[in-house]
Structure formats: structure tokens, C-alpha cells
UniProtKB/Swiss-Prot annotation:
Keywords: Acetylation, Cytoplasm, Isopeptide bond, Nucleus, Phosphoprotein, Protein synthesis inhibitor, Translation regulation, Ubl conjugation
Modified residues (Phosphotyrosine): Y53
Spans annotated as Disordered: 1-47, 64-117
Protein name: Eukaryotic translation initiation factor 4E-binding protein 1
Length: 117
């Protein structure tokens, strides 16, 4: 930068705001404190930095090709990052859906694990 350059200031403008009158707080359940009716999410970091995610931006990120591709150099963990080698993934997920009444104990108690003695 040269010593002879001048800086021009832009005029300040007010930030547009909108006030919404809420009744007794019933309109906002506890999970919706950081969202707006338009779908914008906002939060702050422990350092005080404000983070605002617009709904349109989040939807674009969700539908982007980058979000649909798996990360590179992902380790192979059977059953977590890849299907188990013993059974296909469809059979594994369906086996949990069809549990017989004999598997469950009376009174809602289920054993944490089984042990042969």
C-alpha cells in the first residue's frame, strides 16, 4: 500500500430486524430455541463467535455430490464402515426386526448378555 492512498468509508446502515410476539413460551419447544420459523439455525461457540446457517445453504450442502461420497482413506471396520463378511446388510438389519416372544423376559427385563456355565 502506498502512503498516499486514501480510505473511503461506507455509510452505516441498520441491521434489519423483525419482532415476533410470543405468548407464554408454549409456541417454542425446548428443541427449537436455536431455529427460526424460516429454518435458519444459529448458535455460538464457547469463544462467543456467532454461527448462522441458512436453510437454503444447508439444503444445498445436503444435496451436493460431496455429501454423497464417502471420505477417502476410511478404515475398513466390518459392521461399521463396511458390511460384515458373514451376512449381507439387508439380512442383518431385518434380523433385529423379527424377534420372537420367547426372546423377551416377562416384566420387561432382558438379560444384558448370555453366559454358558
Amino acid at each position: 500500500m502506498s502512503a498516499g492512498s486514501s480510505c473511503s468509508q461506507t455509510p452505516s446502515r441498520a441491521i434489519p430486524t423483525r419482532r415476533v410476539a410470543l405468548g407464554d413460551g408454549v409456541q417454542l419447544p425446548p428443541g427449537d430455541y436455536s431455529t427460526t420459523p424460516g429454518g435458519t439455525l444459529f448458535s455460538t461457540t464457547p469463544g462467543g463467535t456467532r454461527i448462522i446457517y441458512d436453510r437454503k445453504f444447508l439444503m444445498e450442502c445436503r444435496n451436493s455430490p460431496v455429501a454423497k461420497t464417502p471420505p477417502k482413506d476410511l478404515p475398513t471396520i466390518p459392521g461399521v464402515t463396511s458390511p460384515t463378511s458373514d451376512e449381507p446388510p439387508m439380512q442383518a438389519s431385518q434380523s433385529h426386526l423379527h424377534s420372537s416372544p420367547e426372546d423377551k423376559r416377562a416384566g420387561g427385563e432382558e438379560s444384558q448378555f448370555e453366559m454358558d456355565i
